[in-house]
Amino acid sequence: VPPGFTPFRVD
């Protein structure tokens, strides 16, 4: 999982 990754939102 990349840093800052979420399944809901990726900025």
Swiss-Prot record:
Keyword vocabulary terms for this entry: Amphibian defense peptide, G-protein coupled receptor impairing toxin, Hydroxylation, Secreted, Toxin, Vasoactive, Vasodilator
Subcellular location: Secreted
Tissue spec. comment: Expressed by the skin glands.
Gene Ontology cellular-component annotations: extracellular region
Superkingdom of the source species: Eukaryota
Ranges annotated as spanning the membrane: none
4-hydroxyproline modification, residue list: 2
Molecular function in Gene Ontology: toxin activity
One biological process term in Gene Ontology: vasodilation
Keyword Cell inner membrane among record annotations: no
Function recorded in the entry: Produces in vitro relaxation of rat arterial smooth muscle and constriction of intestinal smooth muscle. May target bradykinin receptors (BDKRB).
Similarity field: Belongs to the bradykinin-related peptide family.
Protein name: [Val1,Thr6]-bradykinyl-Val,Asp
Source organism of the structure: Pithecopus hypochondrialis
